[in-house]
From Swiss-Prot:
Record's keyword annotation contains ATP-binding: yes
Species of provenance: Encephalitozoon cuniculi (strain GB-M1) (Microsporidian parasite)
Identification of the protein by name: Proline--tRNA ligase
Single annotated GO MF: proline-tRNA ligase activity
GO biological process, one term: prolyl-tRNA aminoacylation
Keyword Nuclease in record: no
Alphabetic keyword roster: Aminoacyl-tRNA synthetase, ATP-binding, Ligase, Nucleotide-binding, Protein biosynthesis
């Protein structure tokens, strides 16, 4: 096979966008479809989402969240009930206006999100404080007709997500859940995807339309120097409950009632793209080992036409024994026993698909009761005993995960610049960093920062998008007595800025 067709032709450090597309397509995570911005999720990518689905479902069920499913269509009248909410999505809403040749009198939208679909039911189901809290979650797809450039996993017209919708009698309960869910999202990235994230609160300009406030986790993509919103947890306050008349009596026997406090929260398949962008290299995809569909591939080595039948059968039996050990211990293992391709071809085949560990087993390995273990992320090799090999492999999976997270964290931290002036701000931005800067918190100032930082990249003919607030990180250091980097007003908090997807 032509090496140029089999391997990557773009370099991560030279053409990041092309490199990324090659990683996820040649790595068989995703494929293109006839409609721009819609993608085919291949089994390798879908398995990662399945791991996230399984882990998160278990965690939220422990919090009392129940799974449900609501229709994907929303009447125009319902979608437009919350002004700020609909304005947030209006340019991206896809409308169904015809059925065959018949124009519909009442157009319906395909859900961009489900608040206005779900909350009419909440108003029917909630009457008493005994009906609270109500905690629902659905796994589904949404459609947002992106008008800007699309990028697989990161920004598409249709994508998969989960969306949680909850209602509480008190603000305290609501606020506690917002942060509890945000912590779970952070754990998805750290414990499954080996990706570090920053937890914080969105600015007023960047919060979800119709929310009291929005919290988010933000990741950093070193290859592009951009931040990316990794998940969000919103406090809706009583905004939607007032709109949809969702009320509950406040006490036993009381005739008074109050509007409930609501939250919504979600994570999407963007998470898969974030992990691929951060961990992959110029050889192809690098999958976090805990979510890889195949965690270990076994490649027999040294079998040729000159090998005796008895030796070959002995080696195959030895390899099968290793494979059974791993399978019985719950390791996801694949034996590549194809006879029509070389061992070298198999190495390349599995490297580009990101399989975390490779076991190379030949006649010498069998003679010493060993196998050669190769890590995908570092390409480091070592001989391991086949006695207790399942335990060895499981330890290596954890070590690899921890190493990947540590490397990504170190890289991210080295690219966070603390600045005190707009000149330092722009220098850091042009060096593809994200920035912690003292900021006044005023919306008009944020708009001006984005405008001022939109300029031609000095290293190309491309106009770089402006920086925006990514979040106001929780636990960031105080900025007492400092001035805003843009308007020179009194700064109220250090804020994370950056160009973003």
């Amino acid at each position: 096979m032509d090496k140029q067709k089999f391997g990557l032709t773009a370099k991560k450090e030279e053409d990041f966008s092309e490199w990324y597309v090659q990683v996820i397509t040649k790595g068989e995570m995703i494929d293109y479809y006839a409609i721009k911005g819609c993608y085919v999720m291949r089994p390798l990518g879908q398995f990662v989402w399945k791991c996230i689905h399984k882990w998160f479902t278990k965690k939220i069920e422990e919090l009392g969240v129940q799974e449900c499913y609501f229709p994907m269509l929303v009447p125009k009248s319902m979608l437009e009930m919350e002004k700020d909410h609909v304005e947030n999505f209006s340019p991206e809403v896809a409308w169904i206006t015809k059925c065959g040749n018949q124009v519909l009198e009442d157009p319906v939208a395909v859900r961009p999100t489900s608040e206005t679909i779900i909350y009419p039911s909440f108003s029917k189901w909630i009457r008493s404080h005994r009906d609270l809290p109500l905690k629902l979650n659905q796994w589904c797809s949404v459609l947002r007709w992106e008008l800007h450039g699309t990028l697989p996993f990161i920004r598409g017209k249709e994508f998969l997500w989960q969306e949680g919708h909850t209602a509480f009698l008190t603000r305290k309960e609501s606020d506690e859940e917002v942060l509890a869910i945000l912590d779970l999202y952070s754990q998805i990235y750290s414990e499954l995807l080996a990706v570090p994230v920053i937890k914080g609160r969105k600015s007023e300009n960047e919060k979800f339309g119709g929310a009291d406030y929005t919290t988010s986790i933000e990741a950093f993509i070193p290859g592009s120097g951009r931040g990316v919103q990794a998940a969000t947890s919103h406090s809706l306050g009583q905004n939607f409950s007032r709109m949809f008349d969702i009320k509950a009596d406040t006490d036993e026997g009381s005739e008074s009632s109050s509007f409930v406090y609501q939250n919504s929260w979600g994570i999407t398949t963007r998470s898969i793209g974030i992990a691929a962008m951060i961990h992959s290299d110029n050889l192809g995809l690098v999958l976090p080992p805990r979510v890889a569909m195949t965690q270990v591939v076994i490649v027999p080595c040294g079998i040729t036409t000159a090998s005796s039948k008895d030796d070959t059968e002995s080696l195959r039996a030895y390899i099968n024994g290793v494979c059974v050990q791993l399978k019985n211990s719950g390791v996801r293992v694949h034996l590549d026993d194809r006879s029509n391709v070389t061992a070298g071809f198999k190495f390349n085949h599995w490297e580009i698909r990101g399989v975390p560990l490779r076991l190379e087993i030949g006649f010498k390995d069998m003679a010493s009761s060993e196998a050669c273990l190769v890590r995908r992320d570092t390409r480091a090799k070592k001989q391991v005993s086949v006695e207790g090999i399942a335990h060895t492999v499981m330890e290596e999976i954890d070590t690899m995960h921890n190493d990947m997270l540590a490397r990504a964290t170190s890289e991210r931290d080295s690219r966070i610049s603390y600045v005190k002036s707009f000149e330092e701000f722009m220098s850091a931005l042009d060096n593809k960093n994200i920035i912690m800067a003292p900021w006044c918190g005023i919306s008009e100032c944020e708009i001006e920062i984005k405008s001022r930082s939109t300029r031609a990249d000095p290293r190309s003919d491309v106009v770089s998008t402006g920086a925006k607030t990514l979040c106001i990180p929780y636990g960031s250091k105080p900025c007492d007595g400092m001035k805003c980097i843009n308007c020179n007003s009194q700064a109220v908090h250090y804020t994370l800025f950056g160009r973003s997807y």
